Amino acid sequence: KLHGFGLDREYDLLVAEHFDEAMLGAGGVLNVGESVVRGDLVLTDTDDEWVTSLVVNWSYSWVWGGHNVSGVAEYFFIGFGLRQDDYRPDKIAASDELIGRIQRGELFTLGRHYLGASMQVEVTPLLNVSPNLFYNLGDNSALAQVILQWDLAQDWQVLGALNLPLGPPGTEYGGLETGQDDLNLGTGPGLFAQIAFYF
């Protein structure tokens, strides 16, 4: 891996081997006005072909109504994902490269094209709220999320999240078809809460 600076930009170059597959990567960071744009491109040599993956994001921070706010917008392309919205069980099962990466915890999505957006609003110095949206461009389903982080007291923190999957049955976030009538594999709205004490 090579990390460097040049022309007021930061860059990384990577040559690696992962699970017997050669990988080439390049990434960079540059300032655009008062915002920051980051991007990474990875080429993976599988048994059959070179597969491309790409992520580009834009981030910006500002003060809104007296509160510190930071926002991020991101495009994610994963060449191992399934094309468009064909998430039938036989298509998923036949995608060995995708399934292997999901099982190893390298990927968490089925499709190829995604948009993401997030904001972090500092309501008070001890309370942050972050609305997030993860949108699958192939099947028009999404996951909406609101995260709350509250530093309750010295060494105490409360973390909470509300998750809302959006989309019709047969989509990634609306629920995948199982091949059985009226039975989809998905999740409904969810609520998570955690109280942590650090010592």
Kindly give the residue locations of the regions a language model identified.
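Residues on the lipid-exposed face of transmembrane beta-strands in outer-membrane beta-barrel proteins
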Residues: 2-4, 26-30, 39, 56-60, ...
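Residues that define the transmembrane beta-barrel architecture of outer-membrane proteins
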Residues: 5-7, 20-24, 50-54, 67, ...
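Extracellular/periplasmic loop regions
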Residues: 36-122, 171-183
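C-terminal hydrophobic structural anchor segments
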Residues: 110-159
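Outer-membrane beta-barrel "beta-signal"
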Residues: 162-164, 182-199
